[in-house]
């Protein structure tokens, strides 16, 4: 272990010697922990990190003055539309995706480094239950979708296949996530095919470039954003693991989307047939000012432009068909070839510019008292996973329906948007639509038919509660055998073992 003198000298070179100001008050064990933490901070890199954070925070916020002139929509030939393509085109995409899955060439990679702080919980988001009748967590829903897509691909091609699940965690989520998976027997996935790894942490910094102490013996650290993926892939030799398994295509997604289709064969097949090295799923923006990043081109290269960087005038622009010109909303759902990820980790990652997140960071004051600030007092520097789009040689985007594939969980109740209630509604409404399409009818408590409402307003409750296990249906397929021509009272819960139908009433 580095000595106090060594660490103090390193901190002086970085201009951060204040981190040892409580040294004399610490007992041996906290001293050792603090030294171990500080020894990991390389002086030159730390000085540069603090300088860049302070400079970035001091820069004027808002859109670059010339951005509107540099902005263009994605070329039409690089954009597919899952819902508006002809059935034969969609079938070809799906069949190619299933073929690649059956050859064990597809992996999924979950971005799960964040805690559920905005949800009002201290554990990882993936462990959250939104109130489904089955009481399933996000992690369980995702694991079961992997199992189902493996099954579907295997049945189509007469083989057994595996979709490895890579889970990027942070110091805050690795332990609870690993324990949760063990407690639930990895949701019946082979543990050898679930690979967890940690992203890096970066110190939080004051507005004048000083690292924050959250305790007398601990630096305030935060994950380096979902764009920390690329350093983490290199740190933990994840691409080498993928190569050993024969993985060529990687589906990267964020933990909080309850409707996410893992290893979606339509998306995989679309990107493979396009020859894409990098791709993104997008949804049509709900309205011009919707706070979502836009996938577009800047100076001729693909990029996600944050909503705060687009002027109201640009956001309102319309295409010739009346749709928004910049309407490709980013949903953190991406496709990469392993070769592209290798190039990013080896060549392009140092070119990624960190983004400033101004936060309320707890700290100890000069007297050593813990302070929980009421307004933002610090800077956390983050990289974004989509910042690598500009390095793609062949970028493609697939537009999907929001009501089928995107309902994020970000806010605690009683928020109007992106809450447990809206996520639960999105999934149950989707399953209700699937049941109607499969020929089910629903009855009220008196045995009368409920109205069939295949199209519901946003955040509206379906007339009947219907939950379908991902192990029964991945995207609405194969339900006729259970539901065709039958009548059910709410709630209908269709699990993998049988059609479990509480208060079932046959016609």
From Swiss-Prot:
Keyword field contains Nucleotidyltransferase: yes
Record Gene3D superfamilies: 2.10.10.100, Spore Coat Polysaccharide Biosynthesis Protein SpsA, Chain A
GO molecular function annotations of the record: UDP-N-acetylglucosamine diphosphorylase activity
Listed Basic and acidic residues bias regions: 78-91
Keywords for this protein: Nucleotidyltransferase, Transferase
Entry EC number(s): 2.7.7.-
Protein family according to the UniProt entry: Belongs to the UDPGP type 1 family.
Protein name in UniProt: UDP-N-acetylhexosamine pyrophosphorylase-like protein 1
Natural source organism: Homo sapiens (Human)
